[in-house]
Every structure is written in structure tokens, then in C-alpha cells.
Amino acid sequence: QAPDMSGDFCDLANTYFLADSIAGFDTNKGEGLLNWKRYRLAPRQAFNLNGYWPVRMQMLDFPDTQYDNDPNLKIKIQKISNRSLRVTIFTSPIEPKMNDAEDPMFAPDFIAGNAGNSNNRIGKGSWNTSASAKSIVYKNESGELEIQKYPFRLILRDAQGKILTQTRHIVDNDSTQVKLLPFNFIKRGSDNSRSINPVFLLSPGERIYGCGESFTSLNKVGQKVNISVVDPQGPETDGMYKPVPFYFSNRGYGFFMHTSAPTTADFGASYIGAQRLFMGDEVMDFFIFFGEPKDILDQYTHVTGKSPMLPLWTFGTWMSRISYFSQKEGLEIAHQLRNNHIPADVIHFDTGWFGAVSYTHL
């Protein structure tokens, strides 16, 4: 089974750090500090429902001179193209090694910095950057990213200024009975490892598409998607042979979650107004894309690589099962298809041809 990472974010043994405010930002460098407030989860009974609320916490760490109760940690913004920005948020003062030049998730052209045409060239994005007492804004003709200082929010807008989505803050719980954990990261009580949990607004009528090859509904709203490779052995479950940490919204934005760690994307399954991204990774490294689906896909594949055009027969009808075990059986199927005028371009033998060869030698 694919791991469901959401369980780690309701563990009472963990320490929770909630994104609170910008403690400083240098627009020239595109870097700043994000303040995180320390919380714990407190059990709570409401009539016949047992749940939990986030409650402020004072650390007992020793020596207290070496640790921060409410740490300031780095946030970084990079201009990628005219339709994309990269947002990286760290959960530790000791930053993990991130070497884009050796990263297999990136296309060679992206690494070289010369993908795209003159208007959308990777690394040459034209964004106007401004700062005020309330926020830092990256804006151009494609859209806008506002980094609100307090309460901290990442706010995405289209070219007309309409809010597409935004991160949630603890103050959003003031008017609700269900106290949803906002944008946070955890420090596990078991081993001090950290994982981050970006939480964004999910709007009424919003539709989400992506996350890789999936046999569930195309619109992922209402689903919890475990983005991790499993062998589902068929199309009857939500397991995925080929998960992809990328999705886009009909509201005009898309996210590439640059991570190979297991991730659980909760698109309004547990809370109708939120997309909750439970990540195994300690860093949020997101590429944010603006525009229509074709624009978003174009920018995403600039970063990760574009597939060459496949041969015509690959777009035809495939006949497959587990499994055809011999050439004779395959030819019999081919004759039956032709005799019954059933179109077919491919007969996929699947496991029948493996024989004694191990998976590692395929």
C-alpha cells in the first residue's frame, strides 16, 4: 500500500510549527525569514466527537540557549519564467543539500537555463518586485504572487487581480468549529525528523487535475491521493503505477511539488475548503505556474522535460491482461480480433513473457 502521510500530522507526540509571519525579506536576493510558532495538539471532546486543537507551546528543550521556541527559517523566491515562480521554504536552519545540476527530476535544458522561447525562457522571467509594510509582491502580465507578512500567506492572483488560492493561517480557525491545522511542519517526537504540510484554499466549484496515472475520477477534488509508487495490479483501486507530484486547477494555477518523498494530497477529502499537502519531505520546493492548462503544462514540461511525439500506433487500442503466456495464445487473440472486426493496435503480453528472468533484469 502507498503510505498515507497524513497520519503523521495528527500525532500527539509531535511538535507542530505553524507558519506565522515574515521576519524579514530582501527583494534583491529573493530571500527572507519566515517565523514559525510552536504548537502542540491537545485532545478535545465535543459531545460525542473526539478531536484535537492546536495549542501554543513553550519548549522544554535543553540547553534552551541553543534552540528557538519560535524559529525564523529561510524562505526563497526564484523567477523561473514569465509564467512561473519557484518558492522554497525550509524547516531547519541546517539546509539540506539541493543540487539542481544533478537532479534527475529536471530537464537538461532547464538546468542549462536555455529552455523555452524568448518570451518564456527559463531563468529569464520578467517579474516586477515590490515591498511594503504589509507584503512582498511578484507581479507581471501573467499573474501575481503576494507574500503577506502577517498573517503569513502565499496569495496567488491572476492578471486581473482575482485570488486563485492562498495558504491558510491559524487565524482562519477563529470562525470555525473544526480547527484545521494551517500551513505547518512537524518535528517528530520519535526521531526529531521534520516534514512539511502546505495548506491552500480550495474554492467552491474548483477542479483539480493531475498527480499522475490514476484510475479514479479525473477531478481529484474530494479525494485523498497518495503520491507514491505501488503495484495496484489493476484499475480497481486508487493505487498508482506512475504517480507524478504535479497538478493544476481550473482556476488558472498549477503546482509542481519538487520532491521524491511520499506525499499525500488531500483535495477537500477531510476538509471541504482546503487542499492539504502532507509531505514526507522537510522542504517545500514548489514551482508555481500561472495560466490556462496548456500554458501550465508547457511551463511544467520546460522544467521536467518534454516527451517526444510517440508513434501513431501507441495512440490506438491496446489489448492487455495478466497475461498472455505464449505466441500461440497471442496469435489466437489476434485472429479473433480480426475475425470479429474489433480494432486493435497492440497486444500486450504483460507478465507472460517474463519467464525466469527477475524484475531487476528487465
Give short role names for the model-derived ranges.
Residues 360-361:
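Conserved small/polar residues in nucleotide/adenosyl-binding loops
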Residues 339-341:
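Acidic (Asp/Glu)-rich catalytic clusters
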